[in-house]
Amino acid sequence: MKLEKLPEEFVQAQPVLEKISEHGFEAYFVGGSVRDVLLGREIHDVDIATSAYPEEIKDIFPYTIDVGIEHGTVLVLAGKSEAEHYEITTFRTESKYTDYRRPDHVDFVRDLREDLKRRDFTVNAFACDFEGQIIDLFDGLTDLKERRLTAVGSALERFNEDALRIMRAMRFASTLDFKIEEKTFSAMRERSHLLEKISVERIFIELDKLLLGSEWRNGLTLLIESEAWKYLPDFQDLALKKVLTELSVDFHFKNSEQAWAALLTRFSNIDVKVFLRKWKVSNEFSKYVADLVSAYELENWDLVSLYHFGLEKALLVDELKIAFGRDIDRERAVFINDQLQIHDKSEIVIAGKDLMDEFSLKPGPELGKILKTIEEKIVKNELKNEQIAILTEVKKMLELEK
């Protein structure tokens, strides 16, 4: 088949493919970008594959960067903007995958079929020339029409080569609403133990995308049915089942933090920060999720808790509570937030230096205690956030200590 109209991203890259062709080599758009064009989805990355070897690409284009030349990839700087920088990879075959993630060795080839047959799924094994002609060597168009994910060739071999493909399949089931072809799913289940060989950082990325997909329930169901959950750090299948059965069917997560918090509210005997440490997430992400889980346990918002967690987290938590069927006052968080004089201690009109100057105080525990007390009183609306009111209050506190 031929595309009626090339997407703008392909049109912009057309001269690159044409130039390679003018030098006697083949060049195609490949991978997920072609799939997304056929699905009418937004393109994120334009990948180009060619029969030209890396050194030949460098001879054709004056401005290039070696970004992965040992694997056949050269970055071509076709223009000044980053959008005009293209990774061009030579057709290749791959040897065994000792680490179940990356090939031990690659060989450059001139044959497009040899390159495409090493790809993960048929819907990712399309090629498209600069005129929009689609090359489909593995019946991917049929799978695309049926919204079916089928491994290219032997599914067992594909997952042996790269076990992360198991998580990618689940992610596609979530983000693209694809079902998994029977033999492909059977191979996923049989090879799920190989996920232990994959870094948790890479698994996290795929699982995170799964959770944010429009059909995340499909993805989580596959995670359970494939038994892949057993090989993820500290995962509990009962918790996953609870999320599927207890969360309202039409709920979609606002962000990653909310999604992971939803899972963790259903885990038993879990220390959120210890759990997330095993997933090697950032401290910022870990704290955010831990805050959401802690806030979820609160019965109601008050001035102190709203100040501590902030309105953004409060609203995310309230969405989860409602989605899990808890009866809450939907307007309370905003109402309480409006009653707060400050939302951060930096908004207090007087700083420690002001108190040191006014009362001849020195830095130390006493000053810290005074500042903390002032902050608490302002939050509870027991003290106005005004200079005279605060100085008067501090004076009283110091007199009581004499």
Swiss-Prot record:
Cofactor(s) required, per the database record: Mg(2+)
Residues the entry annotates as binding ATP: G32, R35, R119, D162, R165, R168, R171
Pfam families, A to Z: PolyA_pol (PF01743), PolyA_pol_RNAbd (PF12627), tRNA_NucTran2_2 (PF13735)
Amino acids binding CTP: G32, R35, R119, D162, R165, R168, R171
Reaction it catalyzes: a tRNA precursor + 2 CTP + ATP = a tRNA with a 3' CCA end + 3 diphosphate; a tRNA with a 3' CCA end + 2 CTP + ATP = a tRNA with a 3' CCACCA end + 3 diphosphate
Keywords: ATP-binding, Magnesium, Metal-binding, Nucleotide-binding, Nucleotidyltransferase, RNA repair, RNA-binding, Transferase, tRNA processing
UniProt-listed GO biological process terms: RNA repair; tRNA 3'-terminal CCA addition
One GO molecular-function entry: tRNA binding
Positions contributing to Mg(2+) binding: D45, D47
InterPro entries reported for this sequence: Bact_CCA-adding_enz_type3_sf, CCA-adding_enz_C, CCA-adding_enz_firmicutes, NT_sf, PolA_pol_head_dom, PolyA_RNA-bd
EC number, UniProt record: 2.7.7.72
Stretches of the chain forming a coiled coil according to its record: none
Quaternary structure annotation from Swiss-Prot or TrEMBL: Homodimer.
Note: A single active site specifically recognizes both ATP and CTP and is responsible for their addition.
Family: Belongs to the tRNA nucleotidyltransferase/poly(A) polymerase family. Bacterial CCA-adding enzyme type 3 subfamily.
Protein name per UniProt: CCA-adding enzyme
Gene name of this polypeptide: cca
